[in-house]
Design a protein with these regions (language model features):
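C-terminal catalytic core of tyrosine-transesterase DNA break-rejoin enzymes
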Residues: 4, 22, 69, 73, ...
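Active-site/catalytic core of tyrosine-dependent DNA strand-transfer enzymes
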Residues: 128-141, 147-215
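Catalytic-site neighborhood detector that most strongly recognizes the C-terminal catalytic loop/helix
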Residues: 38, 46, 97, 107-111, ...
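Conserved hydrophobic/aromatic pocket- or pore-lining residues that grip, position, or stack substrates
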Residues: 13-16, 24, 34, 55, ...
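Basic, Lys/Arg- and aromatic-enriched nucleic-acid-binding interface segment
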Residues: 3, 7, 22, 26-28, ...
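N-terminal core-binding DNA-recognition domain of tyrosine site-specific recombinases/integrases
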Residues: 1-18, 23, 41, 195-201, ...
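C-terminal secondary-structure termini that scaffold catalytic or DNA-interacting sites
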Residues: 91-100, 107-148, 160, 192, ...
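Proline-centered turn/helix-capping motifs that create local helix->coil transitions or kinks
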Residues: 20-30, 90-97, 111-117, 166-180, ...
C-alpha cells in the first residue's frame, strides 16, 4: 500500500470521526493525532508548447483540435471544454479586431450517478442530457462549476476565435440539414446530433496522436498544466493573471502545482550566467583581476 493511499484513507476516517464527534457519538477524533506517512508528490509529465504544436499539426479530428486549442489558450478542464456554450463567448468581428474576444466559463459537463442527481435534488444542475442506453446508472449533466472562482472570463487569441467561428458555421449547416433531429443544447463541443462530445472520445483520439507521434503519454488534463506553465513564461511570472485564467481559488496552487520548470529553461539559465557573470570580458574592471 502506498503512502498516498494511506493518506487518502486517513482523510476519509478523519472526516467520518469528525462528524461522529459533532453528533456526540464519541468524545475525541482518534484520527487527528494519528501518524501518517508523508506522501511523495509525483510531478506529472506534461507536453511542452512545441509538443502541443506537433499534436495540432498532426490532428485531423476537428473536435479534438478545438479541444486542444481551448484547453491550452483558456486553461480549461475537460468538463469546462465540453460544457462551453455559444452564448458564453464574444467572437464577433469587432471583438476580434479589438483583441477582446473571450470565452466565459460558467458551466461544465460531468457524468454523475442517477442516485446522486436524486439526492442533490438537481442542485447546481442546469440540465440532464438524455441517456444513450436504457440501463445506464449514470447520466451526463450540464452543471455549475464547483467553486465561484471557476467562473471566469478568459480572453482568446484571434486564431482560436477564428477556429470557433468556422466550427459555428459548420454546426449551423448541420442544424439546418437535420432540422428537428438535431438536439440543440447550444454546445460548442457537440456531436452530429447535438449531444455533448464524450470525454472518453477525446481521450481516445488524443491517445491515437500520442501513439502516432511518440509523444509523452499524458492525460488530457495535462494540457491545463502546459497552459499555466506557458503563460507563466510568457507573462514573466505574472501569477495573478494566470490564476485568473485558470480559475484557481488560491494563487499558490498555480506556483506549487503547476509551476513546472522545464529543462530547456534551466539550461538557458546556465548559459545566461556563463555569459553574464563568468565571461571575463563582461566583468567590470575591478573584478577582472580577482
Amino acid at each position: 500500500i502506498t503512502e498516498s493511499t494511506v493518506n487518502e484513507i486517513h482523510k476519509v476516517l478523519r472526516s467520518c470521526f469528525r462528524q461522529a464527534v459533532k453528533w456526540d457519538m464519541m468524545e475525541k477524533n482518534p484520527a487527528v493525532d494519528a501518524t501518517v506517512p508523508k506522501a511523495k508528490k509525483q510531478e506529472r509529465e506534461i507536453w511542452t508548447a512545441e509538443m502541443l504544436m506537433q499534436a495540432l499539426e498532426a490532428c485531423d479530428n476537428k473536435m479534438l483540435k478545438i479541444a486542444f486549442h481551448l484547453a491550452f489558450t483558456a486553461t480549461l478542464r475537460i468538463g469546462e471544454v465540453l460544457g462551453l456554450t455559444w452564448d458564453a463567448m464574444d467572437i464577433s468581428e469587432e471583438a476580434i479586431a479589438a483583441n477582446r474576444a473571450y470565452v466565459y466559463i460558467n458551466k461544465e459537463v460531468e457524468r454523475v450517478s442517477k442516485q446522486a442527481v436524486e439526492e442533490l435534488n438537481s442542485k447546481d444542475i442546469i440540465l440532464i442530457f438524455p441517456s444513450q442506453k436504457k440501463n445506464n446508472k449514470t447520466v451526463r449533466v450540464l452543471k455549475s462549476p464547483k467553486t465561484d472562482s471557476s467562473k471566469r472570463k478568459v480572453f482568446t487569441p484571434k486564431s482560436v476565435a477564428q477556429c470557433l467561428i468556422e466550427l459555428k458555421k459548420d454546426q449551423e449547416e448541420i442544424i439546418e440539414a437535420l432540422g428537428n433531429e438535431y438536439q440543440n443544447y447550444n454546445l460548442v463541443m457537440a456531436t452530429t446530433f447535438g449531444l455533448p462530445i464524450g470525454d472518453s472520445y477525446l481521450r481516445t483520439k488524443m491517445q491515437d496522436i500520442i501513439d502516432e507521434l511518440g509523444l509523452p503519454d499524458v492525460v488530457f488534463h495535462s494540457l491545463r498544466h502546459t497552459s499555466v506553465t506557458y503563460k507563466l513564461k510568457l507573462s514573466g511570472g505574472d501569477i495573478k493573471a494566470v490564476q485568473g485564467d485558470s480559475g484557481h481559488a488560491q494563487a499558490d496552487m498555480v506556483t506549487e502545482v503547476y509551476g513546472h520548470i522545464l529543462d530547456e529553461d534551466r539550461r538557458k539559465n546556465a548559459e545566461l550566467m556563463e555569459n553574464a557573470f563568468y565571461n571575463k570580458e563582461n566583468l567590470n574592471p575591478q573584478m577582472k583581476n580577482q
